Amino acid sequence: MQIPSSLQSSLQGQNQKAELAGHLLSTLTTYKYPEHGPSVLEVVDIQKKFQHFQALTHINLDLKAGEFVSFLGPSGCGKTTLLRIIAGLEKPDYGKVIKKGTDITLLSAEKRHCGIVFQNYALFPNLNVEENIAFGLDKKKWDKAQRIQRVQQLLELIELPDIAKKYPNQLSGGQQQRVALARAIAPNPDILLLDEPLSALDAQVRLNLRQRIRSIQSQLNLPTIMVTHDQEEALSISDRVVVMNHGVIEQIDTPHNIYYKPQTQFVAKFIGTMNFLKANCAVPNQLDVLGFIPLNLEQQKLKTGQNYSMGFRPEVVELVDDFGSDKESLYLPIKVLSTEFLGAKRRLFCAIHIDGIEQAKHLLQIEIENTKFKSLQELMFIKVPNQLIHVFDQQGYALC
């Protein structure tokens, strides 16, 4: 795979920083290069520090035409700082922001032709909806007829055609956010930037509005970046997700791969739920889980004498009565401590059961169909197919 020259040149000398090598490797091996034409936006080796706090470290990513990308991560991971650098509201200490082949790193925000929607809407309280939406059009000197036509077109697009004369304090939170979205896209920006646009709304409004945002974005074929800490939000509407942690990119991938093929232990922990158990490699191609339960992984390059962490999702588990003998699955003895009714499914909280003793430090979550949940026994077993098990090395990087 050909690495873009701008990215290749900017990365020279990075390998000298040993403490960052792992994260750089993770970023580069999951970096998705454009397959069909040039990128709309490239972020090349961006770094940012606030006094003694390293906010961003060697950030590399791209945005394609019509693509919806989410920056996902916990508070303080650097996702909003990265968005602000792309928007021109912050300047990086090092690196470049390239839009349609032009270096815009030092270009002011108003000249970048990006629409921005903030968490707090930022509508002008003294202007009505029509005037709020038209604010950017007035600055670009649209004539009156064009402005009226564009505002009405956008009100139809956000499905609020009759509120043009209302003021922000007369609107619900969801309506205000839709007006903020209309204002951002009114001047036909090249890129739309969304900074946690739904976090101030209640759950049902968020669900409806995120689908509306995605629908509008798709209709306009508008390249979009959204910052969020909500996993479901990012996975449900994004073409790709950028998972960030402590100022670095852990993984850039499709929502499907982020969930089913996490490249680091952090991604596996942060996205959904995963059960982790310690394991070590005493003989080639085999892990001893908890020191005594064999797990055969013939296709994996395990190093004898090394410790590993293995994990599996709650929904891939099958509850069985006996310890199986097949080598294609991992069997674990468990005792069910409590359950939660989830409608069609039931969540079980279990402890590994060794020599008749519950191992409190080895607690597991599993999910099964409610119809398969009959009764609790003193000792039961779970079955996990080997191909659905994830193995991570001591540095937290995935082997499978």
What is each model feature region?
Residues 68, 107-266:
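ABC ATPase nucleotide-binding domains
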Residues 87:
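Helix-to-loop junction immediately C-terminal to a conserved catalytic motif
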Residues 80-83, 179:
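ABC ATPase nucleotide-binding domain helices that frame the ATP-binding cleft
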Residues 2-23, 28-29, 274, 286-400:
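Non-catalytic connector elements of ABC transporters
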Residues 95-103:
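Conserved ABC transporter NBD signature motif
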Residues 72-74:
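The feature captures the beta-strand-to-loop junction immediately N-terminal to the Walker
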